[in-house]
């Protein structure tokens, strides 16, 4: 068995976990989901879902990974009791991570494309619809993203992924603070913040609740083993409740900042906050094109977007790489080559899905991106979280006592006895109910 790699510091662990969580889910998907689902109402439900569902599942995932000292492909097998078959869910984790990269790498390429356009001053001659329909642009930038990710991952854990993520996360936070402060100077800042932060309870319904839960899991990257792999890279000197809280606070801080950057700009320039996936492309690009010094503000904006998206690409690809290496025994370089080629080929479905590989899986206007997102956000993330909750808290799985003993090992915030009903009953029941409701109300056609 290969000796397990280790992260060099607690800061590296928190930054790497937060980097995996912070990404397109926070700075691309969260703002347009918030805009489409009532602004402040969605924000309130999202934060509640983070606290009562996201935090418990993250603690469970860290605990299982650290106890098993394995990637998701084997972590259930190492902790399950003789004769059980929980290990089958490790394969689902691998499928979910690959499906996520089938569209996430393409979206990261879009962001990189916009960054290059603003940096070179050619930001006025392109639009989102034209870009996604251009096969050459999509394939080229997808290739750049995948190659960059797996070249970085080919180095050892501390010298490659951990070091790069620390620098990227620091730069990301600095850039976001600068952009948020600038956005607060807009004439429509007060109106934008009111929409974003003040709940309108009349807009809360079942669809919004399901959207908030799916977004919470998507944003935190829990349910697919992304956090478990980082848990397997750390020692037992810190209790996991506190570590999870740090990651979620950082993740939420970035999501809130993203809205502060975007919504004041939308209300200042009279732009539609319900624009959907194009909100951060056509909408924000339009804002910068009409703003004094807009080229440079746009460059900074899409630079922070690149850092955010690439941090998640690196984290998820590390998870895929770890699982494949455990299955095959390959070295890091060989695993990176094979995984990189495989993800690139699969992601071509999304990259070409608006042109030569057009595919409409659901309602009119849907494409490959929606198909992969449906698999991940609507299925693998909630079902993976449900399986994890049942495994950790049920006598049929690892069991509550073993889970708590692992989670509470080390210094810091610990699980308390009063939390047992929340973890054991509320979390799995809430996830199951919301999942079934979401499937029943999904816009299939």
Task: Tell what function each PLM region has.
Residues 6-17, 42-45, 84-98, 141-145, ...:
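Select transmembrane alpha-helical segments in multipass membrane proteins
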Residues 310-315, 336-354, 370-405:
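Hydrophobic alpha-helical segments of multi-pass membrane transport proteins
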Residues 1-29, 57-62, 66-88, 235-239, ...:
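Membrane-interface "cap" regions at the ends of multi-pass membrane proteins
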Residues 3-5, 32-37, 67-92, 105-160, ...:
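Inter-helical loop and helix-membrane interface segments of multi-pass membrane transporters/permeases
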Residues 33-37, 88-97, 144-168, 229-237, ...:
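Membrane-water interface regions at transmembrane-helix termini and the short interhelical loops
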Residues 11-49, 225-231, 241-245, 249-252, ...:
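Transmembrane helix-boundary motif of multi-pass solute transporters/channels
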Residues 361-362, 367-392, 412-445:
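A generic transmembrane alpha-helix motif of multi-pass inner-membrane proteins
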């Amino acid at each position: 068995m290969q000796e397990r790699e280790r992260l060099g510091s607690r800061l590296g662990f928190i930054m790497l976990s937060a980097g995996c969580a912070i990404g397109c889910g926070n700075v691309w998907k969260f703002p347009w989901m918030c805009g489409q689902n009532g602004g402040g109402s969605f924000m309130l439900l999202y934060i509640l879902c983070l606290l009562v569902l996201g935090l418990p599942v993250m603690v469970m995932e860290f605990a299982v990974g650290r106890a098993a000292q394995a990637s998701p492909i084997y972590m259930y097998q190492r902790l399950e009791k003789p004769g059980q078959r929980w290990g089958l869910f490790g394969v689902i984790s691998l499928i979910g991570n690959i499906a996520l990269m089938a569209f996430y790498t393409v979206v990261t390429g879009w962001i990189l494309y916009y960054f290059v356009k603003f940096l070179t001053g050619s930001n006025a001659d392109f639009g989102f619809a034209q870009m996604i329909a251009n096969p050459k642009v999509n394939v080229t930038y997808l290739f750049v993203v995948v190659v960059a990710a797996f070249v970085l991952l080919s180095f050892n854990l501390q010298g490659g992924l951990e070091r790069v993520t620390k620098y990227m996360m620091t730069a990301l936070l600095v850039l976001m603070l600068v952009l948020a402060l600038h956005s607060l100077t807009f004439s429509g800042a007060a109106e934008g913040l009111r929409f974003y932060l003040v709940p309108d309870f009349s807009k809360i319904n079942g669809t919004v609740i399901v959207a908030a839960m799916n977004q919470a899991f998507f944003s935190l990257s829990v349910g697919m083993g992304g956090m478990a792999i980082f848990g397997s890279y750390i020692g037992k000197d810190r209790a996991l409740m506190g570590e999870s809280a740090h990651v979620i606070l950082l993740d939420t801080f970035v999501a809130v900042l993203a809205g502060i950057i975007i919504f004041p700009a939308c209300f200042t320039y009279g732009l539609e906050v319900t624009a959907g996936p194009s909100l951060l492309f056509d909408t924000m690009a339009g804002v910068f094109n009409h703003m004094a010094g807009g080229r440079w503000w746009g460059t900074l904006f899409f630079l922070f977007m690149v850092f955010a998206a690439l941090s998640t690409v690196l984290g998820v690809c590390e998870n895929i790489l770890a699982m494949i290496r455990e299955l095959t025994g390959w070295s890091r370089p060989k695993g990176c080559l094979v995984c990189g080629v495989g993800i690139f080929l699969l992601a071509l479905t999304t990259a070409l899905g608006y042109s030569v590989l057009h595919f409409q899986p659901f309602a009119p206007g849907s494409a490959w991106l929606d198909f992969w997102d449906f698999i991940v956000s609507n299925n693998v993330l909630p079902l993976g979280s449900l399986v994890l909750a049942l495994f950790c808290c049920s006598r049929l799985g690892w069991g509550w006592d073993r889970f708590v003993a692992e989670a509470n090992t080390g210094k810091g915030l610990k699980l308390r006895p009063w939390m047992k009903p929340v973890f054991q009953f509320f979390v799995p029941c809430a996830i199951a109910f919301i999942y079934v409701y979401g499937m029943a109300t999904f816009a299939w056609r």
